[in-house]
Each structure stands twice: as structure tokens, then as C-alpha cells.
């Protein structure tokens, strides 16, 4: 099977995105991520396999899903609505196919490159007018490196620029190969925490490979100017003065120039609940501390800094 005919699970394709790279963009969210960030805003994208979303508020109480479920995994609570026994459910999706109220639906859809482009290339005129394009995100796009490479090549034939959104946790050679493609104009590189103990505690993996890959891209003349560092900021976790200053020193060492600060938000809590999980709630930095972090990067380190999603 060629990469052109291959397919991946796509969680969603978000049109008119303005915070996933420059200009107006279409963001493609690929399913599967090796990290398990406790504050993840797309937790339904972590598992590489298909999952079933349950939205009790949409349930009309017809009971049809209960009748057709071959695993007897669905029940109806008079007060809480529809309930799925995740230990019994085998994600056959028979219920989702029959639920026109959309109380049950799959997290993702299997899509080929042509199917992705059929949607993404619809807005080319907006990309051209705003300096936008397509952003490949996740999950973690490196999980599907070969597929992403083929997608980028097909996008190039249509004269559309690509932005890669990555945690940097993956094969360095594969990342560099993607990043060096002429059609890739921007790389959004996540910096969860420079402290490895904190990183392991809150993402489930070491940051050693992430920092090595970041240094590689920052020191490569073909990719260094494409880098945008993205820093999710969680109060008391990765926003301490020690961590912020260590991060800034590392940025100076490798020559990083552009930084996006992303204060924590709790949008992932309901998404996690809808796939049967529970996500801890955190807090963003105070407005005062966020401003100090911004000023540190901007006025002391002379970096190009912006804050996204500021409340």
C-alpha cells in the first residue's frame, strides 16, 4: 500500500484556525500521542486507537443503543443519562452509527490524504491572502511521520504552506526530514517543562529526547528560522521562577527567537469525561505572574513573545 492510499485516524479538521501558526489555517488533528499530559486539552487524541464519545446531554432516551449493543455495554441512568461500560465495550461503533442524536459518536474518522485535502484545500484563497496554510497537529504528528511526509508533498503540489505542531518526542531523523521540507514554513514546538522530573511526572515521559531534537532543529540553518516555541503554563507546575529562568537560558543557548505562552485552560476536562476518563483540574498563572514571565522573555532575553488564549 502506498502512502498516497494509506489512511490514519483523524480526530477533526478545524477550519479558520488563527492560533495554530500564522494567518488563517486549517488544522488537521491526527490521533495518537506518546505523551499523557495531565492538562492535555485534546485528551481524546492521546490513544492511537478508535474510541467512543458519550455525550449524555444529547441523549433523547430512546434506548435503541442498548438494544443493539452486542456487548451489552450500554445502560441508561434516569439521572445521569447514557452510560458505557468501557471495560466491556469493544468499540464496534454499532451504537454510534444508529444514534442520530449524536449522544454516541466515534472520536475519529479514518481518512486518506486525498480525503484530508478535499477539505483543507477549500480555503486556499484565505491562506494566500493571510499567509496561512495547513497545520498538522495531534495527538503527535510524528507518530505518523511517513504519512505526514506524503501529506506535505501533496500539499506542496497545490501551492499551500504547512506548519507542523509537535511535542518533539519521536525519531529525530524523521522530524528533521519533515522540518527541512521546503513547503514547511513553521514549526510549533511544545516545551512542557525543562525540568525532567517535572516533565516525567506530568507527561509520563522524559524530556531528554525532546530537548535533543529541539537543539537539533535550532542549530540547523534549514530549520532554525521556522521554530516557534510553545509553552503551556500551569500554576505551580511548570511556571516556577526556577523553571522559567532555566528555560530562558536554554533558549538563549540554542538561539530560539519566537515564543508563544499558553496559559492553562480546563477545556480538556469535559473531553476526557466524554471518553470515560477523569482529568485533574489545574490553574493558570496569575495575571501578574504571567506578565512577569512575558516581560522576562521579551525585555531581558529580547525574544518575540505572544500570549495565546489570554483570558
Positions of predicted regions on the chain:
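Auxiliary Fe-S-binding modules of radical SAM enzymes
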Residues: 1-22, 233-311
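Conserved dinucleotide-binding and phosphotransfer motif residues
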Residues: 102, 158, 300
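Conserved AdoMet/S-adenosylmethionine-binding subsite of the radical SAM
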Residues: 114-262, 267, 272
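Short glycine-enriched, charge-decorated loop/helix-capping segments at active-site entrances
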Residues: 45, 54-56, 200-206, 275-283
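Iron-sulfur cluster-binding cysteine motifs and their immediate structural context
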Residues: 38-45, 64-84, 94-110
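N-terminal pre-triad scaffold of radical SAM enzymes
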Residues: 11-64, 82-91
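Extended, non-globular alpha-helical segments
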Residues: 54-60, 108-123
Amino acid at each position: 500500500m502506498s502512502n498516497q492510499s494509506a489512511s490514519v485516524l483523524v480526530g477533526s479538521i478545524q477550519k479558520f484556525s488563527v492560533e495554530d501558526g500564522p494567518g488563517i489555517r486549517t488544522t488537521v488533528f491526527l490521533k495518537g500521542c506518546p505523551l499523557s499530559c495531565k492538562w492535555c486539552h485534546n485528551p481524546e487524541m492521546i490513544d492511537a486507537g478508535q474510541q467512543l464519545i458519550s455525550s449524555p446531554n444529547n441523549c433523547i432516551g430512546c434506548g435503541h443503543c442498548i438494544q443493539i449493543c452486542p456487548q451489552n455495554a450500554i445502560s441508561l441512568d434516569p439521572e445521569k443519562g447514557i452510560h458505557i461500560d468501557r471495560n466491556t465495550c469493544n468499540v464496534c461503533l454499532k451504537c454510534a452509527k444508529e444514534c442520530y442524536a449524536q449522544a454516541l459518536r466515534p472520536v475519529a474518522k479514518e481518512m486518506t490524504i486525498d480525503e484530508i485535502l478535499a477539505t483543507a484545500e477549500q480555503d486556499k484563497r484565505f491562506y494566500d491572502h493571510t499567509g496561512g496554510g495547513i497545520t498538522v497537529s495531534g495527538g503527535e504528528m510524528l507518530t505518523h511521520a511517513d504519512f505526514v511526509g506524503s501529506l506535505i508533498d501533496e500539499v506542496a503540489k497545490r501551492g499551500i504552506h504547512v506548519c507542523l505542531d509537535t511535542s518533539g518526542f519521536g525519531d529525530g531523523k524523521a522530524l528533521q526530514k519533515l522540518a527541512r521540507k521546503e513547503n514547511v514554513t513553521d514549526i510549533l514546538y511544545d516545551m512542557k517543562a525543562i525540568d525532567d522530573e517535572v516533565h516525567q511526572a506530568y507527561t509520563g515521559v522524559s524530556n531528554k529526547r525532546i530537548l535533543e531534537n529541539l537543539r537539533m532543529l535550532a542549530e540547523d540553518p534549514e530549520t532554525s528560522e521556522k521554530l516557534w516555541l510553545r509553552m503551556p503554563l500551569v500554576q505551580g507546575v511548570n511556571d516556577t521562577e526556577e523553571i522559567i529562568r532555566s528555560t530562558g537560558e536554554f533558549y538563549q543557548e540554542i538561539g530560539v527567537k519566537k515564543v508563544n505562552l499558553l496559559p492553562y485552560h480546563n477545556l480538556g476536562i469535559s473531553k476526557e469525561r466524554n471518553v470515560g476518563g477523569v482529568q485533574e483540574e489545574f490553574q493558570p498563572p496569575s495575571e501578574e505572574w504571567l506578565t512577569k514571565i512575558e516581560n522576562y522573555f521579551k525585555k531581558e532575553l529580547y525574544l518575540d513573545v505572544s500570549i495565546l488564549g489570554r483570558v
